[in-house]
């Protein structure tokens, strides 16, 4: 497990990446750069909108900063999670594997697997993707950690579903995070949700 992670922020522009580099060095905080597939993507799948970076180019840009406090991470990788034309499930899984392999080779450390669009097959697809990642990480002598799950923002987590997610994730020794919702929801610069501390306490115990 990667300890003492401070915050996860999407690298939506080069300016944001540079600012996070400055902040993490100044305050000595670990920052996770959580890249959606729209933002940063394998060149085999068209690259991303952030400076038109491919996964490799993004990784090279971050590594040039020589900042071990910046942790490259993948956010919401799963079938039907990228904008554009949607493929059939088999093709979507193939594309996810292409994307994840590039992540692993280019030293992304935390991989968020989100199969929430796969219906009743979500755990089977997640297992396939996570087993694939572990195999490729081992073959390439890389160390990775998993985040798993997805919920609609601003809606409190369903405890029954959360328990199932937690049980599934417990099968992977290199787990890092599980997704749960607290009721908090920020839109623009405003907090329009309601943080529920009692719900958070229950989920923590689960």
Feature roles, as predicted:
Residues 17-24, 54-66, 95-104, 126-139, ...:
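Short amphipathic alpha-helices and their capping/turn segments at secondary-structure boundaries
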Residues 73, 112, 147-150, 179:
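Generic enzyme active-site microenvironment
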Residues 3-13, 109, 122-142, 152-206:
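Active-site capping/gating regions of soluble enzymes
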Residues 13-15, 37-39, 76-80, 115-119, ...:
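Active-site-proximal loop/turn and secondary-structure-junction residues that shape catalytic pockets
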Residues 1-92, 98-100, 107-109:
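Alpha/beta catalytic barrel-like cores
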Residues 93-94, 117-127:
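Membrane-interface helix-loop-helix junctions at boundaries between adjacent transmembrane segments
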Residues 31-33, 111-116, 178:
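Hydrophobic residues within beta-strands of alpha/beta enzymes
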Residues 104-116, 120:
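A glycine-rich phosphate/pyrophosphate-binding beta-strand-loop-alpha-helix module
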């Amino acid at each position: 497990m990667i300890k003492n992670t401070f915050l996860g922020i999407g690298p939506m522009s080069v300016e944001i990446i540079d600012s996070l580099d400055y902040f993490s060095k100044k305050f000595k905080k670990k920052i996770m750069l959580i890249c959606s597939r729209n933002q940063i993507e394998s060149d085999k799948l068209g690259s991303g909108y952030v400076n038109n970076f491919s996964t490799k180019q993004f990784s090279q840009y971050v590594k040039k900063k020589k900042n071990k406090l910046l942790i490259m991470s993948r956010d919401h990788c799963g079938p039907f999670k990228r904008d554009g034309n949607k493929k059939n499930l088999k093709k979507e899984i193939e594309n996810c594997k292409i994307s994840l392999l590039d992540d692993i080779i280019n030293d992304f450390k935390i991989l968020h697997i989100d199969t929430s669009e796969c219906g009743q097959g979500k755990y089977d697809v997640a297992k396939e993707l996570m087993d694939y990642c572990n195999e490729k990480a081992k073959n390439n002598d890389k160390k990775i950690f998993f985040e798993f799950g997805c919920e609609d923002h601003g809606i409190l987590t369903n405890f029954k579903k959360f328990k199932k997610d937690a049980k599934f994730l417990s099968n992977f020794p290199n787990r890092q995070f599980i997704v749960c919702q607290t009721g908090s929801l920020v839109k623009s610069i405003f907090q329009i949700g309601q943080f529920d501390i009692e719900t958070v306490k229950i989920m923590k115990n689960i």
